[in-house]
């Protein structure tokens, strides 16, 4: 499966949406960079939030990429925003664990930017599942708190730190390659 497109999850803040233009732009560029690498952006499609993950999906579409939105609830009408989600996976599950489990396990690796409790949950699921994690530095939230660390004493995998979107994508691709 040498030519298989990889599914790169972008996990980021929905929280109170008080992030500034710099984080919004960084998330969009992250999505563009995944698209430029020829891979797929997977993100948590939120009906009621314009999260950093959603910004990454927009960026991917701006660069001609493919996006997969994993949403909560039931029925395809849960997702009303159009134009930047190519494939929608409706889990029938709620936020807070169930939907995040499906989201993360649909990814070959994840990149976290800032992040509240949902991003923390997604990072923990990735860690437990040995799915590579890269975090964007200086973005606040759980990405910054867990960057460069192991989540627990088992030392399964470290949340690697990247400074730029290009570096983040390069790191996830290398981690996936190493993982085999």
Language model feature labels by segment:
Residues 28, 32, 36-38, 43-125:
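Acidic/glycine-enriched connector segments
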Residues 2-6, 19-21, 52, 60:
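Accessory recognition modules or surfaces
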Residues 18, 76-79, 141-145:
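Short, charged/polar "capping" segments at the starts of alpha-helices
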Residues 22-26:
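Alpha-helix N-cap and loop-to-helix initiation/capping positions
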Residues 11-12, 96-166:
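C-terminal binding/interaction regions
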Residues 14, 45-47, 139:
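Residue-level signal for short, function-critical loop segments
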Residues 172-180:
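Short, hydrophobic alpha-helical segments
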Residues 4-19, 33-40:
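Generic N-terminal amphipathic, Lys/Arg-enriched alpha-helix
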